[in-house]
């Protein structure tokens, strides 16, 4: 019999004996004997359940929006990449501030360019000769000062034009570069369309070639049939042959045979394999 003291010393789960002393039996941890109806735990569990419900709600409703966002982002990247590459290329070849207003070499460069332009204009149109004739007729002629004044006036005009129109010239160059790039893109699209048209023509030509090949093959097959039928031959299908279709013929070839030739070949092979009788 079991000793009552030993029964008392047996290990029992904590709080098992106090189970019915707890007010809320449904919220009791049977292993630890603790009351689970604590406000902190209840609040945490309610918050977790709410968060899980919200996450399930958002995960069930928002995937389509996420897919749309991914597609739009891919389209934006596909459109932005060529634009950024073109802008880098264009900025490398047509940078801003090619004529810098803060450079120390601005005025000497402008003066040098003005002198070069004045001499080019004078050589082409003979401005000094024309103006000297006009001044001589009006009695303001001087062999030294008039040409100098003419060149100085031209130099000042060229210098002022370079000062005020340099930025416009740079912008004009950039705009022309953009125009050239756009024209090149349009030409590339036209060439791509022509390539597609050529590809379509190639497909049409390939289809015509396939039809011509099919017609030739059909004509060859019809001629073969006519020749076979006119010469009195019979075409044996593989289903009509009861043995292997690689049976050797009398001529040493491998071909299909009629029923009569197959039977004769089988008889010859059986006769060859039979043992020869021994003469006594």
Swiss-Prot record:
Q: Where in the cell is it found?
A: Cytoplasm; Vacuole; Membrane
Chief subcellular location equals: cytoplasm
Query: Has UniProt tagged this entry with the keyword Membrane?
Result: yes
Any single Gene Ontology cellular-component annotation: fungal-type vacuole
| Membrane topology designation | Multi-pass membrane protein
Concerning InterPro entries, the annotation shows: DUF999
Q: Which domain of life is it from?
A: Eukaryota
Which residue windows are transmembrane per the record?
107-127, 144-164, 178-198, 199-219
Q: Could you say which protein family the record assigns here? A: Belongs to the UPF0494 family.
Name of the protein in question: UPF0494 membrane protein C750.06c
List the keywords (alphabetical). Answer: Cytoplasm, Membrane, Transmembrane, Transmembrane helix, Vacuole
Query: Lineage, please?
Result: Eukaryota, Fungi, Dikarya, Ascomycota, Taphrinomycotina
Give the species this sequence originates from: Schizosaccharomyces pombe (strain 972 / ATCC 24843)
């Amino acid at each position: 019999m079991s000793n009552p003291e030993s029964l008392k010393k047996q290990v029992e789960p904590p709080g098992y004996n106090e189970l019915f002393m707890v007010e809320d039996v449904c919220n009791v941890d049977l292993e630890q004997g603790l009351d689970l109806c604590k406000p902190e735990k209840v609040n945490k569990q309610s918050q977790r359940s709410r968060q899980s419900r919200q996450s399930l709600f958002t995960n069930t409703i928002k995937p389509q929006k996420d897919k749309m966002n991914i597609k739009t982002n891919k389209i934006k990247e596909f459109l932005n990449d060529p634009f950024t590459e073109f802008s880098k290329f264009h900025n490398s070849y047509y940078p801003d501030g090619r004529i810098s207003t803060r450079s120390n070499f601005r005025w000497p460069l402008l003066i040098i360019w003005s002198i070069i332009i004045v001499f080019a204009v004078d050589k082409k149109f003979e401005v000094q000769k024309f103006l000297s004739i006009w001044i001589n007729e009006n009695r303001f002629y001087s062999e030294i000062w008039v040409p100098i004044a003419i060149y100085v006036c031209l130099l000042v005009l060229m210098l002022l034009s370079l000062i005020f129109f340099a930025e416009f010239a740079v912008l004009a160059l950039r705009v022309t570069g953009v125009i050239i790039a756009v024209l090149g893109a349009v030409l590339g699209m036209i060439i791509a369309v022509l390539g597609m048209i050529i590809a379509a023509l190639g497909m049409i030509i390939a289809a015509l070639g396939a039809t011509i090949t099919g017609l030739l093959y059909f004509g060859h097959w019809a001629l073969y049939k006519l020749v076979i039928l006119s010469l009195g031959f019979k075409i044996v299908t593989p289903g009509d042959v009861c043995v292997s279709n690689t049976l050797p013929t009398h001529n040493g070839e491998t071909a299909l045979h009629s029923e009569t030739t197959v039977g004769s070949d089988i008889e010859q092979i059986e006769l060859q394999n039979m043992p020869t009788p021994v003469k006594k």
